[in-house]
């Protein structure tokens, strides 16, 4: 209530003590906020009917939220959002929440994790938008969450289908390799999508693929 009334801004760490979460987000942090145009991402959401909710961030960028009907593995949410990075043509280093899939450190201690500012501060700041970039009232936002919430199964199936479609026209050399290589070599070229960190990402994933195959 204090957050909605503008008295205290609240951040949430999505991953709980059991390594589960009910939401995640991609943090699109543009290099130049003045020239940032969210329409590019809103168009992709609409065209591919993605179950994500775009929300204006505190800094002026865009957060792409996904919600689930129940607690699911934080790793499943991260995996789904990592696939979306390819779909949106975002760099691999783009921030994804939850940042942790477990709060237990290597020393056996508990980590507090990384927090993300939640939307609708004072009810009119960091608000959700539709694919036409129209701001949504808080009550509408809650209804949109309910309509877009996924189960663990539908989340995984949706992500797999997205990658399969993106791989159409992929390089045959990587048919038995990870999706990222096929997408970089063929799928993204077909969709006229460019990855800013394409070379480094390709080299890393190729080495992983080659080590396992040969």
Predicted feature residues:
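Glycine-centered flexibility motif
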Residues: 6-13, 57-61, 89, 111-113, ...
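Flexible helix-coil linker/hinge segments at domain or subdomain boundaries
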Residues: 85-124, 145-158
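Alpha-helix boundary/capping residues
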Residues: 3-7, 84, 145-148, 188
């Amino acid at each position: 209530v204090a957050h909605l009334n503008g008295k205290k801004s609240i951040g949430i760490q999505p991953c709980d003590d059991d390594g589960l979460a009910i939401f995640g987000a991609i943090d699109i942090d543009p290099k130049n906020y003045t020239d940032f145009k969210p329409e590019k991402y809103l168009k992709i959401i609409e065209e591919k009917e993605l179950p994500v909710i775009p929300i204006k961030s505190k800094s002026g960028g865009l957060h792409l939220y996904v919600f689930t009907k129940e607690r699911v593995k934080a790793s499943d949410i991260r995996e789904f959002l990592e696939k979306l990075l390819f779909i949106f043509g975002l760099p691999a280093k783009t921030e994804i929440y939850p940042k942790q899939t477990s709060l237990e450190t290597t020393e056996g201690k508990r980590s507090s994790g990384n927090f993300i500012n939640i939307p609708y501060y004072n009810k009119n700041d960091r608000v959700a938008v539709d694919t036409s970039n129209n701001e949504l009232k808080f009550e509408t936002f809650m209804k949109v969450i309910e309509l877009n919430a996924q189960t663990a199964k539908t989340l995984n199936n949706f992500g797999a289908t997205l990658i399969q479609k993106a791989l159409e026209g992929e390089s045959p050399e990587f048919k038995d390799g990870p999706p990222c290589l096929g997408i970089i070599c063929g799928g993204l070229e077909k969709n006229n999508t460019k990855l800013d960190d394409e070379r480094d990402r390709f080299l890393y994933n190729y080495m992983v693929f080659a080590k396992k195959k040969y």
